Amino acid sequence: MCGITAIFNIHSSAADLRQQALKMSKRIRHRGPDWSGIYQGKTAILAHERLSIVDPASGGQPLRSKDGKLILTVNGEIYNHRELRGQLKDEYEFQTGSDCEVILALYRKYGVGCVEKLSGIFGFALYDEANDCYLIARDPIGVIPLYIGHDDEGHLLVSSELKGLEGFATAYGQFPPGHYFYSRDKDFTRWYIRDWMQYDNVKDKDRKS
């Protein structure tokens, strides 16, 4: 169990919001007593409270790509991370042994399509500094908690728990499972789609009882 918080759409000084981000993160520190980390950019702040499971020595977050342009804060476990790491090791230079760093490698190769490559439970916020855009996503059935909201200034806020948003967000709610939010689309997109979810694929749908 870890805790993540983030502030996006910052159009004034990010330094002014840093203290707010730290307060948001402190409220969920019980989720991750092993490490506290924060990234502050011009339009985004990402923070993380870590409970060490995989790679306790070097897996502190927010994770960053080697060039520092991709930043990730994530709570979860990626079950197929070894398989993905093997597939991507020639295209991406991994900086840690964290199972979650494969998300950065996948995003660099597939963009928002990275989410569909993941097998696991997760809630994450990823900031693409070079393109000034961000991606937020949650696992298929919502095993990992994640909440999203906004304030009167137009900032988008993210937290693993509602208490991270209380008093800062004027409107908030649960981040829908099996969806991602991409800043360039400005809307939620369902990424987890399976045939069995469609009624027309039920074999006996027309049979009368």
Question: What are these language model-derived features?
Answer:
Residues 1-208:
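Cysteine-centered catalytic environments shared across enzyme families
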